[in-house]
Every structure is written in structure tokens, then in C-alpha cells.
Amino acid sequence: MLEIAIGAIIVALIFDFVNGFNDSANSVATVIGTRVLKPIHAVGLSAIMNFVGPFVFGVAVATTIAKGIVQPDDITVYIIIGGLAGAIGWSTLCTYFGLPISNSHSLVGGIMGAGIAGLGFEKLVYGGLTKVFAGIVIAPIGGLIVG
């Protein structure tokens, strides 16, 4: 069982790398491209803010991903690994082809798919999924209105 736990940690770290590879570039591209910040400063600032963010703004999104997609009592380490692997594969493929991608959406889809494959549709938390999908729809509309 220790080997499986270590494997899950390694897969989570790979997902984190893929997430940083994609999302960090999105967040710093403008300030680097316009020469407001040097690349080293932009990446350093991004790293610091990604670390500080959960302490300042909380972990509500992470809690929803952890408990609001699949029934938390039924999740196994294999579902976690499967969800992360699906998100890694999809994010890597889209990044390779230059397609716009949200790793958060990839993670939700990966966990949802692994949960359905391993436990069935009845173990999905539809209230949590409604919240997630509402955010996916509302956020771009809000950005369009405000921006």
C-alpha cells in the first residue's frame, strides 16, 4: 500500500508540474511580453503568489474538488490516480497542440470520469457538480461583462 501512496504522490506532483507549465505561462505572458517585468521576476512573483494564495483566499475550490465531485467516503487512491492521470494526459495533449485549456476543468473531468468508471453515476455529488459547472459558465460571462 505504501508503494501505491508514493505513486499517487508522484502522479500529483506531475499534475502540479503540468498545471504550472500551462497556467503559470498564462498568468505571466502579458507582463513578460509587454516588458513590464523580466521573466525571472514574473515567474518568481507567480510562484510566490501561487504559494500565498490559499492562505489569503482560502481553499474553497480545493474543498469542492476534493468533496464535491464524487462521494468522498467512496473515493479510493486508484480513483485519485486515474483522475490525475486523465487530467495530465488531456492537459499535456492540449498544451502540445497549442489549444487553450484549463487544468482545473481537466482535473474536474478526470476525477468525474474516474469516479464514474470506478463507482458509477450514483456516487457523483450532483450539487457540487452543479456548483462547478455554474462557475465554468458564469466566470467567462462575468469576464466578458467586466472586461
Language-model region placement:
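Alpha-helical transmembrane segments and immediately membrane-proximal extracytoplasmic
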Residues: 1-147
